[in-house]
Regions:
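Charged, terminal alpha-helix-loop-beta segments
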Residues: 1-131
Length: 131
């Protein structure tokens, strides 16, 4: 029912929050610009800039990433490319990816980074301190 859906969204949101705070888990030198930058194709999970100043669009998946995630990321990257000057990278961050999806990603110039579904981030980094 709805409960399972809520839990799923909750942990995807937790993963997003954790990676927004510690983007170096995806790649050293990554700076998160805006967690939810809308570009007319739905919400981008993480929008960042790499150490060389290139824009990076990050698509997060809690489970094994498949074709759907790769196509979604490709659409986001295309949409961002139309709006910003300079190169735009697309990174799919997930615990695992199917072999066909990885081949499609690589053929499309997208990158896959293995990230645990719930990265090990100190608890206090995830929650504002309660006084």
């Amino acid at each position: 029912g709805d409960e399972a859906l809520f839990l799923l969204q909750g942990s995807e949101a937790q993963m997003q929050a954790a990676l927004a705070r510690t983007p170096e888990l995806i790649e050293p030198g990554l700076t998160v610009l805006n967690r939810e930058l809308l570009v007319g194709v739905g919400g981008i999970d993480l929008y960042a800039r790499d150490s060389q100043g290139r824009f990076v669009v990050v698509e997060l998946k809690r489970g094994k990433a498949g074709h759907e995630a790769v196509h979604q990321l490709a659409r986001y990257v295309q949409a961002v490319r139309e709006q910003v000057p300079g190169p735009v990278r697309g990174v799919l961050a997930a615990p695992d990816i199917t072999v066909p999806a990885l081949k499609v990603a690589q053929a499309s110039g997208l990158e896959y980074v293995k990230v645990e579904a719930l990265p090990q981030v100190p608890e206090e980094a995830l929650q504002p301190t309660l006084f």
